[in-house]
Amino acid sequence: MGPRGRGRAGFRGGGRGRGGAGGRGRGRGGSRGGRSFGRSSRFDTARVEEKESSDEDESGKEMGSEVEEDSDVSMSEDEEEETPQNARPYMALLQGFTESSEPSAKRRKLESGTSAAPAQAESESDEDEDEKKVEDLDRVEEAEDPMADLAEEEEQSDDEDEVDASDPFDSHFTTPDEDLTAKRVRAIQKKDWTFKRTMSKVSKAVVTYPQVEDSDAPAIPSPISSLDGLKLKQKLRETASKKLATLNPLQQAIAPTIFSYSDVLYDNRNTQNSEGLRQLVCLHAVNHVFKTRDRVIKNNYKLAKEENSDLELRDQGFTRPKILFILPTRQSCLKIVNTIEELCAPDQRENRKRFEEAYTEDDVKFSDDKPADFRELFEGNDDDMFRIGMKFTRKTVKYFSQFYNSDILLASPLGLRMAIGSEEDKKKMDYDFLSSIEMVVVDQADALLMQNWEHVEYIFEHMNLQPKDAHGCDFSRVRSWYLEDWSKYFRQTIMLSAFNTPELTELLRTQCYNWAGKVRFQADYAGVLTQLGLKARQTFSRFECRSIDKEPDARFDYFVSAILPSLIKRAKSSTGTLIFIPSYLDFVRVRNYFATNPAVAALSFGTISEYADVPEASRARSHFLTGRHKVLLYTERAHHFRRYQLRGVQRVIMYSLPDNPIFYREIAGGYLARSEQDLKLDPGQGTVRVMFSKYDVMKLERVVGTQRVGKMIQEKGDTFDFV
């Protein structure tokens, strides 16, 4: 079975550290942002207080107006993934291509799934039919001919197409210092990295670079005041200046680093700065495409002019696609595409109407109480299974271009994983279109973590490998570092996230090999302890564990031995206890303990996870409000995708902190404040109990603040109270 991944794809042992299931499919429910559910067999045990059936009817009526018709997620199993084979040497690669020099007909899944016919008017009830319809949205019938339009373009007289040593595009890709590059690549191969901490205009920064003797450490470029400080194509500068006449302080500070082709991890993305960051990465991507394209056209003209010369012009990769955007939803893709259009102002837009039909959804789906970050992610078309190619010519941008004919690829992790194909049928797998990617932009990485992060890892593992087929490649034009299998050392990776996590740090460490180094912008956090909006006692309890692989067991043991006894002791007065559990695997463990262990028989409980359907979640919320469920187990992903306004909460126990500090404020502050307003809780009587270990340092810093986190991790005492 291939990587279908509908819903939160399954988990292998621990979901690579997320402790949960994986990738959502079809947005927050049905296709194209629909409101339907699909899920596998579920554990259906909850213990309720024995009451008359009439009580259940009353509680249902009481919650009827409160419970939103929110849908949940569907889930699928995750597949075992094999490590790709080592790339073949250059000579073996050439021998493999000698049998056929002509572009072969496209035989991969992308041909039937890269782009789409218009959606059918009538919805299909059958899931398979529904999947086919959604995949059709991105179908492409175009033949593979990656360089055809470039060969037909006339060369334009443009002195800026000449090599400029001060232009990062040329110094990084076209004419890099061969000696320095070779030394740094060898250092990277030996995993010989070093780092330095510095300050930028907007935050602290950690610069990581390959350690080479007689080489100065890379420095963060100085801020710029306008677009004049960037090496842009003149025609792009003219159009982009209308949209970016002035730069805000963040853009001024971070733009030079992005345009220097260093890897970048920026972990303070939010709803206020997201548009400015999107403008920068789109401008950088289009500038890279234009420079690559114009250089190829100019060299085509030179070669045609001197047919019998020994002129060697290496300006290409194995395949045409150079930019990859990895995005969470079709709506986020729409925003990227619209920004690109605004910056480059093409004369013609081929297939634009079809693009709007497939990626636009104007219906307002959410009530006014949903927060800004939720709206940014889920309003519009929240389908998370898509992929689309964009091709640029001198006056036109074409949507739904065949992948091998495209300059920019935009895809969700699930959509791109399905385009690659299944590990079970390796002959049909195709990831050659990723072989020459020179820039990857991972936007809203925090949202991708709530999907199936293993799809993201899989994509990176199959990027910049030497291709299995020629795809019409002219090897006399391929840059030497491609032939040496060094393309991954030249690729730039840009990750934008609301916060940092171990997964992002690990991806930067294990899959980003840029010889120009890496820059991680590191925010200082004031914490959200004082932003709850009410007075509540907040107690943080640290438990010890020797290694990270023992941490789940240590956390559960601490919960059973130190947290539960007090609840059991006052079982009669434990009504309104919300236990927040970020990891789905931890949730299953705690749920099973509540369901089967006689020690907690006095505690009636309900559950809301990411797999709960609408009636199940509504019933659990109703029983919790009326007291039939004294305890409610609630997962982070359920909150991420639904943002339920739970009522009746009188105390909060956090089995672990959420990655998103906004969730802490909403759960610890918002829920308790609502109970005070409903007179379910006396003012100031709400309590919050948090479990944490030294491995939760990133989460803890965002909640308690940068100044407090060190003491809480290192001090001898293990309990910290805040009021």
Swiss-Prot record:
Belongs to the UTP25 family. Residues 1-177 are annotated as: Disordered. Residues 10-36 have a biased composition (Gly residues). Signal peptide: none annotated. GO terms for molecular function: rRNA binding; U3 snoRNA binding. Residues 52-83, 138-167 have a biased composition (Acidic residues). It comes from Colletotrichum graminicola (strain M1.001 / M2 / FGSC 10212). Keywords: Nucleus, Ribonucleoprotein, Ribosome biogenesis, rRNA processing. GO terms for biological process: maturation of SSU-rRNA from tricistronic rRNA transcript (SSU-rRNA, 5.8S rRNA, LSU-rRNA). The gene is UTP25. This is U3 small nucleolar RNA-associated protein 25.
